Amino acid sequence: MIKMLVCDIDGTIFNGKAFTENLVNCINRIRKDGVKFVIATGRTFYSANQIIKPLNVDTPVICYQGATIHKPSGEIIYEIGLERNLSLDILNYLKTMDIYPNIYINDRLFCEKETEHVKKYSDFQLIPYTIVPDISKNDFKTLNKILVIDNDTKKIEWL
């Protein structure tokens, strides 16, 4: 007997606009049969929660590819991140390659330089971003995610 169904959001159960009626009915049916329905995503909880509200998720939500797990209320029940010193080493290295990644700290998106990539990603993820010219001045202990988006495939391959 199946006890749990874990689904991603983007390109799996969500088409970028809405959940289909068939999907919602299927989720409700498996719940009635005692199957736990769980979301696992690379998104932040803030972003994921805006999308999954219509599904009335009552189980923990796995975010950042497993780096955080949240209760449906948003409370973090598990978190693992990159320590500050390692994060800063990575970010400084990326700067030497003229790469300015999306930086996630405490469910917020930061960038050191505004780019078209961060604007588009922010719109897609439904999460606002904050420009911080020097992230090392931000008082964080751990960083949740560093996301590199660049059109230069040679840079990406080299990473």
What are the residue ranges of the model-derived segments?
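Conserved acidic, metal-coordinating active-site core of Asp-based
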Residues: 97-99, 104-159
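Short amphipathic alpha-helical segments
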Residues: 9, 75, 142-146
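Short, basic/glycine-rich phosphate-binding loops at helix/coil junctions
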Residues: 6-7, 68-71, 137-139
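Asp-based phosphoryl-transfer active-site loop
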Residues: 2-17, 90
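Short, small/polar residue-rich loop motifs at catalytic or cofactor-binding pockets
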Residues: 1-2, 32
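Active-site phosphate-binding/coordination module
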Residues: 21-118
